Amino acid sequence: MFKKLSYLAIFLSSAFIYAQEEEEVVVTGSYIAGSPTDGASPVEIVGRDLIDNIGAMTASDITANLPIDSGSENNADSFTSGATQGRTNINLRGLGLTSTLVLIDGRRVTFSGSIANDGSAFVDTSQIPTIALDRVEILKEGAASIYGSDAVAGVVNYIFRRDFVGFETDITRQQIEAGSARDDRVSFIYGGEFGDSNVVLAYSSLDRSPMLGTEKELAPMGISGLGTSFRLLSGTTTAAAGHPYAGTYTHNPNGLTDPPNTYIRDPNCVANKGIVLADGRCGFKFGPRFNIVNEENHEQIYLSIKRPLTDEIDFNLDVLDATTNVWDNPQSPSYPALTFLSLAKLIQPGTGGSPFDKALLWYGRPLANLFPSPLAPRYISRDRISLGLTGTFDNGFDWDFRVTRSAEDAYGLQPDTGTSQLEDAIAGKGGPTGDQTFDLFIPTNNSQELIDWLRSDQETWTDVELEVVDFVVTGEVGNVAIATGIQLREESIDIDRSANSLVVLDANGNLVTPANMIFLGGGIEVDTSKSAEAIFVEASADINENLEIRGALRYESLEEESTVDPKISLRYQASDNVVLRASVSQSYREPTLAQLYASDVGLEGIQDYNTNGETVGNATFIRIAAKANPNLVPEEADNLNVGVIWTLDDFQAKFDYWAVDYTNVITKEQAQGIVRYTPQSTKVIRTSGTLAGVTTSYFNADYVETDGIDIELTYSADIGPGTLGLGLNATHMMSYDIPILGVKTDVVGLFNQDNFARSMPDTKAVISANYLSGQHSVAAYVRHISSYKTNAALNSTAQSLGIFNADGSIDSFTTVDMQYTYAVDAENVALTVGLKNAFDEDVPYVYDATNWSYDPKHHDPRGRMFTLGLKYMLD
């Protein structure tokens, strides 16, 4: 197939050999020269000035300035985004991380090796060095007819400063007021011309110090009932005098109505930094142990070389190398012993340090409140190289050939305790010598040697790679502008695991042999690949001096499927001041390799329910098995956009109505929804009546139907000695309909903890003002996220805290950023001072089981931040 399409590309290029010459100016969403930003397709451009004015330390700061983004993962979140620590992403219209196509200089980039909790794959935007950015172009509609798979919600194109000439260096510190956490960034960019060659080199390094969970109370619900407790199942038992547990305990035959006589908790629970729960257990408060911001280092190197090879052919090379190290990422001292919540694993008298004369069921963890937190580091290395040739045929028709390879190598460690080691140690056969006993009742009696021997860390090595060949020809035939070309893609994923974290699944994806870990679930190893070949054609013509029509068609051949995706758009100049535009298109997204083949077991905080819909106990972290599904079919979407652009002198207004009808949506079953709505399902795993796990799988959901409105207002005027700029950028979601238990349900304005949609406030907006006068520049940005709500009923613990709104509402969140820059012309120096979240607005509280009690996918928890930057420039 690759060879056939290569021959076809040569034929297509020769077919237009007599076309007329026209200089190429390309905007994201089209390959045709001359596509304007006020054209038929809605494109938002974040320019270099705006990147500087918002004080963007990283690409995620740019994402935070985009109201169209909804539900991305750009804040550290050990509870619901643990596997993706150190990475960032973008989620246009809340349609899913995988439904936004991310490009670098118009070319594809490999997905990250780690996936989000909901199974979404994404391009890691943390690899982008902001100093090397010229602009970011955001296409706000589907574009599969041009770019292929994944361009359902839109396209985000990071365009680098490939023509930069000069030298610029920047040193910036961003200090969080609450605590000692800060970001220190050092970066530079150099561009020079050497004969006919142009070379650009950029480097950026960001060191981020941690913001500890103790510095802000953002996880008050981070309490586990599996701390230091045991359960007596029948009769009476006695512990001898002299032992901390000394006394007689009697089973309550009426259940748990008299907890002290049913659960036997650590008698020194509070003194040992535990927390006594309502049912009598000694709980473990893990929330403050996790960082709000991790200690990280990010480094990026970018190189661009351009030079002519002949009078007709130019050579260009782009190289990007990026590394991320998450150094700390503290966890609980040990995780709950889920594998011991079984009648087959009762703690017998005389074992595990038990002072009792009857067997007990262990509700705990090997190491709890008195022990330090182990670390779960992440190391990520990415490289991208793009080699291109561009030229012009003798008649002036342009061609562009490029080969791009991008890859990511990642390593992650998650500490845990070995099931087999712990069983041996409880039986008195533990440690290097095989004769040590682990004391479950007085953990401080255990030696460090034995504690170290119990460790069974989950280690994962992930390699992903994407190779893309693009060949595009553009020009004109008569009065019709045409672009056509081919694309060849090959994608691979290789996941290796430590032996203790491997699981065995049967043919149906059910767990046969678990990992040798008491809590973490492990997974299978994967080494697979897939390829795709595509051909497309795009055309544009002026029907008259006021009406332009564009059309595109792309055929893409996948390994199991094929798809044809059309698009047609219109631009009508209704008057000197008014432009009308409209577009309709079809888009698709193919399943990712991880969704097809990479079954694994993760962790989620889940609230249990009974068949009456009532909560049972407190939420706790349990194993969530996610079964891959090789039978997934591609998603398909119909996209519509209708807009008007009104320009009057220095004022411009853009209003766009958009709609996406999505079918065969690929998602993972939502574990909380399964437990809440079908608590007796075979997918819900219980051990001795205690919720222990949920089995989920990837599937093609019926549909998502969503629509909304985008608004962009800009105004500029000369006022006094300078220029004033004002702006409003807002997105309002009118509906987001999905099936819940077979019923079409609008989930806009909901937290959506029990379905596959992400949290979804209906309105996000940014109001901006900047004033430039000589050497002085002042900018201010007001960011608003509307209120929304959760439909989860508060449990007794949440009610007792008194911090959550009783009706489930989540307050709106509005922050103000301000920045002042003074340019010292004679010294080529610029000094910048700034405030982010200037009024120190607290994030609104969100009741979300045992996770963070705020929404990391929308709200930045860091509070007020001070910024000081120094920039030096040479032409």
Where are these regions (language model features)?
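N-terminal periplasmic "start-of-domain" segments of outer-membrane beta-barrel proteins
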Residues: E24-I54, S60, S112-N117
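Extracytoplasmic beta-strand/coil segments of soluble accessory domains associated
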Residues: S35, A64-R108
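N-terminal periplasmic accessory domains that precede
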Residues: A59-I62, I90-N91, V123-S126, D150-I171, ...
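Short acidic/polar hinge/loop motifs at secondary-structure boundaries
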Residues: R107-K140
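C-terminal beta-signal and terminal closure region of outer-membrane beta-barrel proteins
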Residues: L413-P415, Q421, S585, G602, ...
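Gram-negative outer-membrane beta-barrel transporters
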Residues: Y657-L794, K871
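C-terminal beta-signal and adjacent terminal beta-strands/loops
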Residues: M734-S735, H784-S796, T821-D875
